[in-house]
Amino acid sequence: MNIDLSPIDRRKVKNLGEVLEMNNEVLGLMSRYLTVCPDFITKELIEGVTGECEITLAEAYTSLLVAACGLDVENNPRDRYLSTAYLRSGIRRLDPQEYRMNPYYRQIRIPEAHFGNWKLTIEKYKPSEAFVCDDIRTDEELKEIPQIGFFDTEFSFPAVMEDVQEWMAIKPNEIETMRQPIARAAGRVVAFGLGMGYYAFMVSEKPEVKTLTIVERDENVIALFREHILPQFLKKEKIDIVRQDAFEFATNCMSDGYYDHAFVDLWHDVSDGYPLYKQMKALEKNSPNTLFSYWIEDSLLSHLRWELFHRMSDLLSATAPAGEPVILRPVYTYEQFVACLRNPFLRKLAGTGLL
């Protein structure tokens, strides 16, 4: 691969690298906050700020979260930029009623039930507790904006716990990140990963969906779903559950073009999902007539973007190792360089095995 840029374009690439560094910095800040103290902000703190500063509730919440993340917006220009360009545009006050009216929430009643170390239960967000509420948003400058939401009141959601760890749940984040795959689904659909059946329920309700095959290898997940959740489905006759490894099924059972759409949800987050995403992307070529969708794909592509940027930067500075594979066409302008880092190209690259 050849990358040959002008001095001006090289400076632009350097500036782009700083943007990607800030993406990682903001992600780290939010990850630490959500892990250590997601309920630090309280109604009393918010009311204190709104009373003193005469700002809206949402503005007060954002200011408190910015301060809790350790950003000094008064004295540090970089911190001020991170607050303005990332956090203030990504924090949202959500309407709990909008989610309570979701068809799954209205139809499915979750009982308290145990399967070995697994427990089907109801968990809660506290008032003003912060949580991830959607996939990251990537703008034209390749800034990646985390989407953080909060409710004014307590919000309950169904979950499966394994001992004390939340294993799966139907929260606003799951609802938002599955909107597009659900909207795309039509004809004969296959879903890799069962979870608590949110995707299955929403897709089965669509008149344009004829059948839904769910591929799941965990017998406990299947048993929990069959006993407590599937009986409440209104269109359960559309659903067939296959206990099998997802990659075996994708390799051996999809080459005939039977499925119109596939949805892949085999991971908990980006850390365990990235290699699985690339593995399934590599199998898409076996099913050219099937449209694939992937849960939290934009976040997975963020990981790939970072990896590719460093590979391209090494090539630009002539520090790439010998035998570097050709993964791109020649790049002679900054615009061509950036195009390789945008999602459309990254989706094509993900399944090639070249990175």
Name every feature range the model reports, one short phrase each:
Residues 1-151:
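N-terminal auxiliary segments of SAM/dcSAM-dependent transferases
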Residues 218-261, 269:
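S-adenosyl-L-methionine
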